[in-house]
Curated annotation (Swiss-Prot):
Gene assigned in the entry: ANKRD7
Keywords of this entry: ANK repeat, Repeat
Keyword Repeat attached: yes
Gene3D superfamilies xref list: Ankyrin repeat-containing domain (1.25.40.20)
ANK repeat locations: 67-96, 100-129, 133-162, 166-195, 199-228
Designated name of the protein: Ankyrin repeat domain-containing protein 7
Residues of the signal peptide: none
UniProt keyword Endoplasmic reticulum present: no
Lineage of origin: Eukaryota, Metazoa, Chordata, Craniata, Vertebrata
Domain of life: Eukaryota
Pfam families, per database record: Ank_2 (PF12796), Ank_5 (PF13857)
Length: 262
């Protein structure tokens, strides 16, 4: 069994940080020579030039570059609030996607430009659009540890149980990033404590696979199910044992929890 679990653990370690994990702070990699004048002005926040270009018939407010980015995408990624407001006044498409299916809202949240994200939400941006990895704006907000952005997105009916390509809900993203405060916050907002990823790993299983003490205590307080198994049949207790988390039985006992294995 040790050999089987060791193989499965190695396999999952490579998958727990996959291309589907939302990463924050990543703006667009821009080469000036590849940008049209309109996009260049939006990316640097030059509102004066942007207005001049849009007065010319050859420029359209929704013009896309080779990677399907609009001026709104670039303004949101770079935090140019005044440009975002102007483009919306010009009736730009607010939910348009780039080559990675990212909407301007997703890009604003990913780059932690909260002012831009707030404007977009107030103007009707869809908080539940998914990028090519099925991450929503909420996944990125959780990864960026922005409680105010998470709160805003939930106020605009962001899906708390949305799953990316790995099956991670925002709660599971918070667990993987070892962020007890965000985990607690999401649970208080009604996140499913027993949600599981594509390998049927629950928050508790993922928690005992990392730096578990605070997270495990928190999840136990929330009544997490102890008997859930991953696709190989392992429970959180078995993950804890093989990861050297030897106090797990004491933790469950101290919270009055008994194991009822299915």
């Amino acid at each position: 069994m040790n050999k089987l679990f060791s193989f499965w653990k190695r396999k999952n370690e490579t998958r727990s940080r996959t291309s589907s994990d939302p990463s924050i702070g990543q703006g667009y990699k821009l080469r000036e020579k590849d940008l049209k004048k309109l996009h260049r002005a939006a990316s640097v926040g030059d509102l004066k030039k942007l207005k001049e270009y849009l007065q010319l018939k050859k420029y359209d407010v929704n013009m896309q570059d080779k990677k399907y980015r609009t001026p709104l995408h670039l303004a949101c990624a770079n935090g140019h609030r005044d440009v975002v407001l102007f483009l919306i006044e010009q009736q730009c498409k607010i939910n348009i996607r780039d080559s990675e299916n990212k909407s301007p809202l997703i890009k604003a949240v990913q780059c932690q430009n909260e002012d831009c994200a707030t404007i977009l939400l107030n103007c009707g941006a869809d908080p539940n659009l998914r990028d090519v990895r099925y991450n929503t704006a909420l996944h990125y907000a959780v990864c960026g540890q922005s409680f105010s952005l998470v709160e805003q997105l939930l106020d605009y009916e962001a899906d708390l149980e949305a799953k990316n390509k790995d099956g991670y809900t925002p709660l599971l993203v918070a667990v993987i990033n070892n962020n007890p405060k965000m985990v607690k916050f999401l649970l208080e907002k009604g996140a499913d404590v027993n949600a599981s990823d594509n390998y049927q790993r629950t928050a508790l299983i993922l928690a005992v696979s990392g730096e578990p003490t605070r997270l495990v205590k928190l999840l136990l307080q929330q009544g997490v199910e102890l008997s859930c198994r991953d696709i190989c049949g392992f429970t959180a207790e078995e993950y804890a044992y093989f990861n050297g988390f030897t106090v797990y039985p004491q933790f469950t006992a101290s919270h009055g929890r008994k194991k009822h294995v299915k």
